[in-house]
Amino acid sequence: MSLSRLSVTGVRNLHPVTLSPSPRINILFGDNGSGKTSLLEAIHLLGLARSFRSIRLNPVITYEQPACTVFGQVELPDQHSRALGVSRDRSGEVRIRIDGQSVRSAAELADTLPLQLINPDSFRLLEGAPKLRRQFLDWGVFHVEHRFMSAWQRLQQALRQRNSWLRHGTLDSASDAAWSRELSLASDEIDGYRRAYIQALKPVFETTLKALLDLDGLTLSYYRGWDKDRPLVDVLASSLERDRAMGHTQSGPQRADLRLKVGSHNAAEVLSRGQQKLVVCALRIAQGHLVSEAKRGQCIYLVDDLPSELDAQHRLALCRLLEQLNCQVFITCVDSTVLQEGWGEQTPVSMFHVEHGQITQLHGPSGVKA
């Protein structure tokens, strides 16, 4: 799938603009602070109804404007298209429309417009908290396993109920048994989906990484959040008093993690910044392959400042892998010439110059390298 039309109003320093991107490679270049990343942010807002740069939405809205609005026309694999629209005002109210109909859940946006973000904060996937790696994992499961969302909602409800009882309820075995059983059932289902996903992801990730980086000894493993040799219901029973003292459930899928190591060391501790970036890129690209294999369409990749941390050889390798995905890619850089050799002659490339918030399309999506 791809965005064939994109309209942006009221996003940071960007002037109101309507673009017709290439279905494949789109390069946005210009000085730092010109607004390149803001366009990626607008696409992210369209796909997830939130920014990747700020938890608060007020900084995203152009100064003295009441709201920011993004519209997009999405071309689907079945030759149909869908119209998406997202608007957020300064009070925090969000309006989502799909094909003219109001929608409540941002999950419907995510399902229609699967986005992969690679930006300077991507290092956090390796060095940050387990929550970030769970989000990465669950994004992938969500897009390949249609039953995941229902199980996830049951898990969250059971967790809320048990945690509330731990903090405020009377300590009795009947209540604990009820909440623990519901939590265990949902947890086993979530764990099964995650485990199957990791089994599919690992070989694709390893193959992708080899194309980017000569790195021996890197391993990817999955920790489910409780003892692999014990049923969760037994773990919950044995840790009841401790959970009660802490006021929350300490074992379960909400404590899961992906572990990337080189030998016995965490990858983030021993890899250079450039190596870390390539590992994260390999993970994101592998996810895109799995989405495509699941017949769920293709991801759209948002790559902010692709050249940073990478030498010419690794920039070229990354461009080639993104090109081989046959998906739509939006890339920002300061100097577009460093990416000119990254694409095949027949790959449609569109070039956009960004200056002081003004976006000018220099080359339309043709079959000739820009």
Swiss-Prot record:
Signal peptide: none annotated. GO terms for molecular function: ATP binding; single-stranded DNA binding. PROSITE patterns: RECF_1, RECF_2. One of its GO terms (cellular component) is cytoplasm. The keyword ATP-binding applies. Pfam families: SMC_N. InterPro entries: DNA-binding_RecF, DNA-binding_RecF_CS, P-loop_NTPase, RecF/RecN/SMC_N, RecF_2. Keywords: ATP-binding, Cytoplasm, DNA damage, DNA repair, DNA replication, DNA-binding, Nucleotide-binding, SOS response. ATP binds at G30, D31, N32, G33, S34, G35, K36, T37. It comes from the Bacteria. It is found in: Cytoplasm. GO terms for biological process: DNA replication; DNA synthesis involved in DNA repair; double-strand break repair; SOS response. The RecF protein is involved in DNA metabolism; it is required for DNA replication and normal SOS inducibility. RecF binds preferentially to single-stranded, linear DNA. It also seems to bind ATP. Belongs to the RecF family. HAMAP family: RecF. This is DNA replication and repair protein RecF. It comes from Stutzerimonas stutzeri (strain A1501) (Pseudomonas stutzeri).
